[in-house]
Amino acid sequence: MRLWPVFIVSVLFHAYAGLRLLPALSGDAWGLFGPTWPVRTLAAVLVVSALSIPLGLLGHRLGRQPFAELAMRALTWVGLLCMGFFSSLMMLTLLRDAALTAWWGAGVAGFQASALTAGEAARLSASAVPLLAAAVTLWGFVNARRTAAVVRVDVPLVGLPLALQGFTLAQISDIHVGPTIRRHYLRRIVQRVNSLDADVVAVTGDLIDGSVAELAHQVAPLADLQSRHGTFFVTGNHEYYSGAHAWIKELRRLGLTVLMNEHVVIEQAIRSGEGSSSGAPAPSGMSASLVLAGVTDFHAAHFDPAHRSDPADALAGAPPGLPRVLLAHQPRSADAALRAGFDLQLSGHTHGGQFWPWNLFVPLQQPFTAGLNRLESLWVYTSSGTGYWGPPKRFGAPSEITLIRLVAA
């Protein structure tokens, strides 16, 4: 990856923001000689941000060399924080430009009711933009770094056997262990998942951002995940960026079952004290089974043709008539899952947009952004993700650990 184009793009975008905001704050044509500390502070922040974003990307690369790891990780943190701040600053600057244009147009047309002069409106809005961007970034950082909350979702399935009433799947997705998400962050997630006492733990991809050599120690807490029937994993696109074959081997070593276009049949005995919907006690020893399948990432074939994602293949040889649950990283697998005959698909990938305004663009690529949705007879639950990617920032799309409970329709 060549970084000089990133430097050029970063400088150009920051220059635009500076030229739109600094003159309004300072009163001079270029906004560089304002006497007030807000002008100097914003100018300094823009310079640091313009340099830190590409240097942060460079730091992620050089951090692979042990001698530079701590310094480069610090540089990566600064760069990603600046990226989060500037993304909000840039969008708010563009919205400010649009609002001022509309305000000016209303005045020309004779509809302006505000007592503010053009200079006052420009100065007040230029002051508000960086303050609002900083507030959003700070709140987003707090949201991103705290342990994901548990979201409980009931999914009604037609003909669900009595022994599967209340069957639970704890879903975690898109943790992105890497430069800023480390072992202690993952350990907190594991502890919260274990407290749910789920029947199954499902990890729906994008677990890591880095190689096994870099991150094996950081993902070790996954070995402590506990559930009645085990932990199941499917690959996401980021596993393929980071060496999917090595990660599949490592996760299996940790005790996870990696489903590569394949399925398992899970038999569930009725829980003690449960009865039928009429209130009568259930017969002793009653049990039922469900099919839990998993597919490789939607785009896995771009990296390895042998990993082509195929929900139909994942069901090959499965017993007929059982409830069928699919783990698929991207919601885009839903069409194929519907054709294959699944009842429920658990996905991630979207992060729920992670922070505004990126949530507005998710529908351009994926059929669902977040939450429980229906595609004809198929239920699709899309997790907003348990970690984050890139900037440590979540705003309007909180991270989650999802506890899916199957109930009779």
Model regions and ranges:
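Non-catalytic terminal accessory segments
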Residues: 1-146
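Soluble catalytic domains of enzymes that build or remodel membrane lipids, polysaccharides, and related
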Residues: 151-152, 156-409
